[in-house]
Amino acid sequence: MIWLEENMIKITFCFFKVIFILLLIVFSSAMLSIVERRLLAVFQNRYGPNRVGWMGSLQLCADMIKILFKEDWIPPFSRKFIFVLSPVIAFTSLLCVIPIIPFTSHFVIIDLNIGILFFLMMASLSVYAILFAGWSSNNKYALLGAMRACVQTLSYEVFLGLSLMGVVAQSGSFKISDIVNSQKYIWNVFPQFFGFLTFLIAGLAVCHRHPFDQPESEQELADGYHIEYSGMKFGLFFIGEYISIITVSSLIVTLFFGGWLGPWIPSCIWFILKIIFFIFLFILIRAALPRPRYDQVLLFGWKFCLPLTLFNLFLTAFLILV
C-alpha cells in the first residue's frame, strides 16, 4: 500500500507538472505573437498594435475574442474529418516535444533515452498537418502550398537530423540531459559550429518561418494551405507556429548552448534568457531578410546545407578519433 501511495503521488505530481508546462508554453506562444508585432514595428520604424489597452497591452485579448467569435466555417466541398484534424496535428506535434526538454537538472517531465529521435519523429509528423490541410481543403492554392511545404520540410529534415549526429557522437548519447551535462566545460556550439548553423537554418525551415515561408506566402498563394480556415482552426495553426519557434529555440539552447548551465544566476533563469535571445533572433531574421524564390530555397539546402553538414560529420569523426 505504501508503494502504491508513493506511485500515486509521483503520477499526480507529474500530471500537474505536464499541465503547468503545456499551459505556460501555449500562453507564451500567444504572447509571442504580440511581442513579434511590436518588435517588427520597431525594426520597420512604424507603430505596432497600440489601440487596445495601454500601449497595446490588451491586443492579445482582443485577438482571442475576435477568433473565438468568428464563424467556425467548414467548406462544403472539403473532406471534413481531415480538414478538422489538420490544425489539431499542427498544434500538438511540436508541443509534445516540450516535455522531453530539461529546464533544469531537476525539472524535466520525461527524460527519454531517445530524446533526439523523438524530436525528429514529431518534427516529421508536423508536415502531415500541412499536407492534410492543403489536400482536404480542395483549393488549388492550398494544395500548392501543401506541396511546397512537403518538399521543403522533407528536404530540410535531412539536414536537421544530420546536424544533430555530430552532437550525439560527441556526447555519446541520444538523451538530452546527457548532452547538456557533456557541455559542462565547453558548449557544443564551438566544436559543432557548422552543425549549429545547419540546425538553425533547418529549424527555420521546419517552423516555416521567414525566409522559408513559401508554403503560406501571401503574395503568391493567398496564404497557402490555411486559406480555407477560420475561427479557432486558424488560431490553432497560428499558435502552433509560435509553439514550434519556442520548441526549436529550446532545443538550440539545450543542444548547443549548454541548456541550463551558467554562472551566478539560477539555472532556470539562464535557460529562459537563452531561449529569449533565439526567439528574438527568429524575429530579427523575419524583419531583415527578403523571401527568396521557391527553387532557390531548395537549391540552397542541397548545395549549401548538405555539404556543410557532411563536412561537420567528417570533422567530428576526425576529432573523436584523434
Curated annotation (Swiss-Prot):
Gene Ontology biological-process entries: aerobic respiration
CC annotations in GO: plasma membrane
Entry GO MF terms: NADH dehydrogenase activity; oxidoreductase activity, acting on NAD(P)H, quinone or similar compound as acceptor; quinone binding
Localisation per UniProt entry: Cell membrane
Spans traversing the lipid bilayer: 15-35, 50-69, 81-101, 114-134, 149-169, 186-206, 237-257, 265-285, 302-322
Role summary: NDH-1 shuttles electrons from NADH, via FMN and iron-sulfur (Fe-S) centers, to quinones in the respiratory chain. The immediate electron acceptor for the enzyme in this species is believed to be ubiquinone. Couples the redox reaction to proton translocation (for every two electrons transferred, four hydrogen ions are translocated across the cytoplasmic membrane), and thus conserves the redox energy in a proton gradient. This subunit may bind ubiquinone.
Family: Belongs to the complex I subunit 1 family.
Stated name of the protein: NADH-quinone oxidoreductase subunit H
Gene: nuoH
